[in-house]
Amino acid sequence: FSAAFLTQLVRFHWKAFPLLQVWGQAGAGKTQTVEPFSHMHYHLKMPKKISAAGNTFFPMVAAVTQSASLPVIFEELKPRQMAKFQLDQVQNLLRTNYNGERLERGSVNRDVAGGGTVVNGYDNVAPIMFIGEALESQSAILERCVSTPLSKEDRDGRSDEFEYCYARRQGGPISWLGRSMIDAALAIKPDLVRDSVAKYRDLFKSKVSRRVYEDQNRPWH
């Protein structure tokens, strides 16, 4: 969520931005964990979440093309409960978001006598985060994701801290932090983002094995 403020700068340099996948068993607190962080991008309004299984495709396309830095959150990504055509559309949306590819849809032109078809283009550039109960199985999507597993055991002993943050999620300290990040993102120089990433890649290289470092198909932003 903090990196989303720099989405456009990251895409400018590397033509890519990874997706975030939060997955785990029912009751692990996936949505309740995501919501406070999403308030870095919202102040008094509640963050918008879209059900991947309960919506038609066009509202999802509209969401990922309306902003280049506001995270879009897809809930209820349950492949077993989705029709094949619907699942193919959602997976294509996720897969093409990594490189910010353009989506195109055909429609009938009602402004011209006799009709006719037109092709509308949409830039799939908003940072995407999706929530599900199982790890995404399609390798083309998985290799473009930062995967974050959660379980019920992760919540043990942390309820007081979580309740403190959750109760103050709307218009509170998390929103103020987000405003500070917006100001910093607007003031940052594009070259600083590039140089900082290069610096931390070198640090990462010195800390891990060669095999891990050379797995460049995994997102590292």
Regions found by a protein language model. Name each.
Residues 41-65, 105-106, 153-162:
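Flexible phosphate/Mg2+-sensing switch loops adjacent to catalytic phosphate-binding sites
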Residues 1-54:
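P-loop NTPase catalytic core of nucleic-acid-dependent motor ATPases
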Residues 73-75, 106, 122-133, 147-149:
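Structural recognition of the conserved hydrophobic beta-strand(s) that form the central parallel beta-sheet
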Residues 17-21, 71, 127:
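Residue-level preference for the first positions of well-ordered beta-strands
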Residues 59-112:
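Conserved nucleotide-sensing/catalytic segment adjacent to the nucleotide-binding pocket
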